[in-house]
């Protein structure tokens, strides 16, 4: 089913943007894992609407409720149910759009598939659905951190045509979160914020690129052919709202190189299980399996589809109309998408870790 993700570390999200609540059921989490609930809440706060002048003005505290699966902060190995209640819904903002197919939204395709759709807030297509992913991903991050000291760092690399260059060796979470746009390059971040504000005042929006770095990745994650690690990462990240592109390692720029330039040569080592490579054009994955190097990815997000300008479209009768959106929306989704990217990467790695252990650790 389309609301379920993962094979062993398995999540099922539920809820709509303007419904009573949104949440997740996480199944397959190993027992006896100590969970810091404050860290889950912190990830939700990073995703929360209304956190700055360049995000949607919708006001939600996004307070986490854990209904099952933990005892005194320790996982039981049973399903972990988590939810966040919606408190600032305004479905009346969408009354005039009930039968309108908004440009580049899911209204038209949902109607074509189901013959019915949630009229307000985008329903399941809303980024509010990602609350469940972020909550479950925060647990996955703690599992990976506990076992391998794995660290997942995502940041805004580009907004519109304003790009940044970041020293990944000095990258920290505190640097990423040092400004409201979540770009660790302070000078570039200032320009990004200004660009978003300008477009916001014009009733317009913009997109950009989020980059993700994963450090201390255990080798051996992923499988050949259909369950390659990069394939599952691509699927996970492209399932996020507004995503339009994914690349790993050298990505599309690697097509400009020769094989002699692109190949990642292994370095001599006394421990064959701790191999290193001279370069990392592969982005930490070869043959669909992690090699222990950093995993490096980029994800492209389109401009927010809801804008304050008049646009021509059609209604459910196929008649052309002119519409102007109301409601509360982000002029740029990227600052709030950073924890979403972190979470989807964590969910994939946690699932592949358990799959690897199940297949390859039973016989010594």
UniProtKB/Swiss-Prot annotation:
Pfam families attached to this UniProt entry: Chorismate_synt
Ranges in coiled-coil conformation: none
Residues the record lists as binding FMN: 124-126, 287, 302-306, 328
EC number(s) stated in the UniProt entry for this protein: 4.2.3.5
Pathway(s) per entry: Metabolic intermediate biosynthesis; chorismate biosynthesis; chorismate from D-erythrose 4-phosphate and phosphoenolpyruvate: step 7/7
Catalysis: reaction(s): 5-O-(1-carboxyvinyl)-3-phosphoshikimate = chorismate + phosphate
Record key words, sorted: Amino-acid biosynthesis, Aromatic amino acid biosynthesis, FAD, Flavoprotein, FMN, Lyase, NADP
Co-factor remark: Reduced FMN (FMNH(2)).
GO molecular function: chorismate synthase activity; FMN binding
Needed cofactors: FMNH2
Keyword NADP assigned: yes
InterPro entries the record matches: Chorismate_synth, Chorismate_synth_AroC_sf, Chorismate_synthase_CS
Origin: domain of life: Bacteria
Gene Ontology biological process: amino acid biosynthetic process; aromatic amino acid family biosynthetic process; chorismate biosynthetic process
One GO CC term, this protein: cytosol
UniProt: NADP(+) binding residues: 47
Subunit text: Homotetramer.
Role this protein plays: This reaction introduces a second double bond into the aromatic ring system.
PANTHER family: CHORISMATE SYNTHASE (PTHR21085:SF0)
HAMAP family found in the cross-reference section: Chorismate_synth (MF_00300)
Stated family: Belongs to the chorismate synthase family.
UniProt-recorded name of the protein: Chorismate synthase
Source species: Prochlorococcus marinus (strain MIT 9515)
Taxonomic lineage from the root: Bacteria, Bacillati, Cyanobacteriota, Cyanophyceae, Synechococcales
């Amino acid at each position: 089913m389309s609301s379920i993700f993962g094979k062993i570390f398995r999540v099922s999200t539920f809820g709509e943007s303007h419904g009573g609540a949104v949440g997740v059921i996480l199944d397959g989490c190993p027992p006896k894992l100590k969970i810091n609930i404050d860290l889950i809440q912190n990830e939700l706060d990073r995703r929360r609407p209304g956190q700055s002048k360049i995000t949607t003005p919708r006001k939600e505290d996004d307070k986490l409720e854990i209904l099952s699966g933990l005892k005194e902060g320790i996982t039981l190995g049973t399903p972990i149910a988590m939810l966040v209640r919606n408190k600032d819904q305004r479905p009346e903002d969408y009354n005039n759009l009930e039968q309108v197919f908004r440009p580049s939204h899911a209204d038209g395709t949902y109607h074509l598939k189901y013959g019915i759709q949630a009229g307000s807030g985008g329903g399941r297509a809303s980024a509010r659905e990602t609350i469940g992913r972020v909550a479950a991903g925060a647990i996955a991050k703690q599992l990976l951190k506990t076992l391998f000291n794995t660290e997942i760092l995502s940041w805004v690399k580009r907004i519109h045509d304003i790009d940044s260059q970041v020293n990944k060796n000095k990258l920290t979470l505190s640097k990423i979160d040092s400004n409201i746009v979540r770009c660790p390059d302070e000078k570039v971040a200032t320009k990004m914020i200004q660009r978003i504000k300008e477009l916001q005042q014009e009733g317009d929006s913009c997109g950009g690129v989020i980059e993700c770095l994963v450090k201390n990745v255990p080798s051996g994650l992923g499988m050949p052919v259909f369950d390659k690690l990069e394939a599952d990462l691509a699927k996970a990240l492209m399932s996020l709202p507004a995503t339009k592109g994914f690349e790993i390692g050298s990505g599309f720029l690697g097509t400009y190189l020769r094989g002699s330039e692109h190949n990642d040569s292994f370095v001599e080592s006394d421990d064959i299980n701790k191999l290193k490579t001279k370069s990392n054009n592969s982005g930490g994955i070869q043959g669909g399996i992690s090699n222990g190097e950093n995993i490096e990815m980029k994800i492209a997000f389109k401009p927010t589809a809801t804008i304050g300008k008049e646009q021509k479209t059609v209604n459910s009768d196929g008649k052309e109309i002119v519409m102007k959106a109301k409601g509360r929306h982000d002029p740029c989704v990227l600052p709030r998408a950073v924890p979403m990217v972190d979470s989807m990467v964590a969910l994939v790695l946690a699932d592949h870790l358990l799959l690897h252990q199940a297949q390859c650790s039973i016989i010594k």
